[in-house]
Amino acid sequence: MTDITRPENPESRCGFVAIVGRPNVGKSTLLNHILGQKLSITSRKPQTTRHQVLGIKTEGPVQAIYVDTPGMHEDEPRALNRYMNKAAASALIDVDVVVFVVDQLAWTSADEMVLEKLKRVKCPVILAVNKVDKLEKRELLLPHLEALSKKRDFAEIIPLSALKETNLEPLESAVGRFLPESVHFYPDDQITDRSERFMAAEMVREKITRQLGAELPYSVAVEIEEFKHQGNTLHVSALILVEREGQKKIIIGDKGERLRSIGQEARVDMERMFGSKVMLRLWVKVKRGWADSDRALKSLGMSDF
């Protein structure tokens, strides 16, 4: 493993940490459990994360600024997929540490593709072997870790379970050791750089993803049209964009039941995060070809890198 030494007992450390990996290995779950609250949306469906999400964790003198990225995947022709790949790749620029997340004993061509992209990275790369709680034959883990250690000179290799919060402390400790001495960039109580509007849109999109499962088309986006505090109530109006009428019917459901359920669950999460009563209104609109249009992506805040 790489021997990267840092001065002992620094007064203050701060830096950027990119969390990368192929889709559905648990990157967003890892970030959420490190922070101690939900910031990135999660589901069993791969490629749920579309944006870089900045999560900030401050523990005493150490401030780690985590960037949760979309899963890197094989090249796709759609503009949305190109955007997601660019978002993931851009997270590797000017970071201080990379956490490369893989799925326990599984190693795929997509993992190899991510590893290939990491060859250009000069900072420490920590390999986080996630979901070890699901291993049926634990005796296979050590040989697998030894095989992984030969693929790259990793700064650390840490088996963990993000969901069960197993071995997260060694991971955070390793990240902290590799961060540079620096003043903190953010207030110690700040956990993200994202706006409340962005977080509201992500909460709605998560509920759509979780409720629809295999029915969900990837080409679903959420646009916040109103986000306004009036007295003790937060009024939020969100537009759900799909590409076809059939997708619209799926999201609305029989007599609007599915859409109401999505709204109820999203509202509960918003009230918990924003600390106020929320009045949430949802609409569904067909916008054909938005996931293939660079212009449409930019209008939704998904700009080129």
Swiss-Prot record:
Keyword Thylakoid: no
Domain KH type-2: 204-288
Keywords: Cell inner membrane, Cell membrane, Cytoplasm, GTP-binding, Membrane, Nucleotide-binding, Ribosome biogenesis, RNA-binding, rRNA-binding
Sequence segments annotated as region (G3): 68-71
A Gene Ontology BP annotation from the UniProt entry: ribosomal small subunit assembly
Cellular localization per UniProt: Cytoplasm; Cell inner membrane
Region ranges (G4): 130-133
Span of the signal peptide: none
Region feature G2, mapped onto this chain: 47-51
Membrane topology recorded in Swiss-Prot or TrEMBL: Peripheral membrane protein
Primary location class: cytoplasm
Region (G1) location: 21-28
Residue ranges, annotated region (G5): 160-162
SS bond list: none
Domain of life: Bacteria
UniProt record similarity statement: Belongs to the TRAFAC class TrmE-Era-EngA-EngB-Septin-like GTPase superfamily. Era GTPase family.
Function: An essential GTPase that binds both GDP and GTP, with rapid nucleotide exchange. Plays a role in 16S rRNA processing and 30S ribosomal subunit biogenesis and possibly also in cell cycle regulation and energy metabolism.
Record text on subunit structure and interactions: Monomer.
Protein name: GTPase Era
Source organism per UniProt: Marinobacter nauticus (strain ATCC 700491 / DSM 11845 / VT8)
